[in-house]
Amino acid sequence: MAITDILSAKDIEAALSSCQAAESFNYKSFFSTVGLKGKSADQVKKVFGILDQDKSGFIEEDELQLFLKNFSSSARALTDAETKAFLAAGDTDGDGKIGVDEFQALVKA
């Protein structure tokens, strides 16, 4: 499944262009602009499955760093600071990774 099966290419482009500069990534505005905030729990789970590159059931820090590349191969990697802030926001149980329930809560935040 491709991410464009769930989200529109136009919304993805708008979301990516809003965070092209280093240190400009904001997960709340990204999820809103990309259209994920308005998707069903099932659709959000499918996006989680795409982001969970190693299929471990979690999005780990290295996968988060490449988060934007899941939306477009030409997108930039997140900076270390952006990655750590994103992980801290999503990792509510403190295990160092984001599970599917944590991701759903993060999207709806």
UniProtKB/Swiss-Prot annotation:
| Residues that, per the record, bind Ca(2+) 2 | D91, D93, D95, K97, E102
Keyword Calcium annotated: yes
InterPro entries for the chain: EF-hand-dom_pair, EF_Hand_1_Ca_BS, EF_hand_dom, Parvalbumin
**Sequence segments annotated as region (In silico-predicted IgE-binding epitope):** 59-66, 76-81, 79-85
Stretches assigned to the EF-hand domain: 39-74, 78-109
Asked whether the UniProt record includes Glycoprotein among its keywords, one would answer no
| One term of GO molecular function | calcium ion binding
Where is it made, tissue-wise?
Answer: Expressed in muscle (at protein level).
- A single GO CC term, please? cytoplasm
Per UniProt, where does Ca(2+) 1 bind?
D52, D54, S56, F58, E60, E63
Disulfide feature: none
SMART domains tied to this protein? EFh (SM00054)
Q: Which UniProt keywords apply?
A: Allergen, Calcium, Metal-binding, Muscle protein, Repeat
Reported temperature dependence: Thermostable between pH 4.0-9.5. Average melting temperature (Tm) across all pH values is 74 degrees Celsius.
Q: Which SUPFAM superfamilies match?
A: EF-hand
Similarity field: Belongs to the parvalbumin family.
Q: What function is annotated for this protein?
A: In muscle, parvalbumin is thought to be involved in relaxation after contraction. It binds two calcium ions.
In its UniProt entry, what is this protein called?
Parvalbumin beta
Name of the encoding gene: LOC109314825
